Amino acid sequence: MKFYFIRHAPTYANKSGIMVNGYENADIDIHDKPEDWEERVGQYIPEEARRVIISSPTRRCLSTSKMLFGRYPDEVTEALGEFDCKNLGNRKFWEISEEEFNSLVYLPSSTMAKRANEILTDVGNLIKKEHNTDSVVAISHGMIIRYLYHYITGHPDVSAYDIINSKGYAFSNLDLLVADVNPGVCNLVFSYHYSKPMERK
């Protein structure tokens, strides 16, 4: 199965660079598709892969599907949902220490690895069986996709603190990560960046 992972379009919180309470309900403007997204990123997603779209259940991911592809996802799965970091409240996570982060967010690498395996194996097999396809567009979140990158490239023990701070791999809104997953083997194909990562101030 070849996955085309896309991070959702930016919400007001992404644009402001802060975490906010109730972010799980944040939405985007479905009429605000960047004119150059297809040229810079979308061109790397073949028509066959666009036939089936899966997504996190959050509004911003559902709306990103509608914005980019003109329709809502064919399937919605909690496996693509965001890791739970709500206890951070409105803190700027790059301004807090790793110790403080870990006191607020319990997210060991084993938990993230379990989720990655669920996406790449269980969800992939289900989509292949139900839709008779070998490729799928998957719309998800920054932390999930950044962790998948590390997992696929042989670094499953990376910390949640490093993931949320984009250490070792930055992945911004509307970026694309392509991963080719075969039985027992995950291969990173490439990542295509729509925009530069936000500068932290």
Regions of interest found by a model, annotated:
Residues M1-K2, Y44, E75, E82-W94, ...:
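Acidic, low-complexity terminal tails and accessory targeting/binding regions
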Residues K2-E75:
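Active-site-proximal alpha-helix that buttresses catalytic centers in soluble enzyme cores
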Residues K2-I6, I54, H131-I144:
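Beta-strand elements within well-structured catalytic alpha/beta cores of enzymes
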Residues A9-Y12, T58-C61, G81-E82, G142-I145, ...:
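Short, solvent-exposed loop/turn segments at secondary-structure junctions
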Residues Y23-K33, V105, Y161-A170:
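A short acidic, glycine-rich active-site loop
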Residues E24-D29, L68-D122:
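Phosphate-handling substructures
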Residues E39-Q43, N117-K128:
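Generic structural signal for well-ordered alpha-helical scaffold segments
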Residues M67, Y147-Y151:
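Active-site signature of alpha/beta-hydrolase-fold catalytic machinery across serine-
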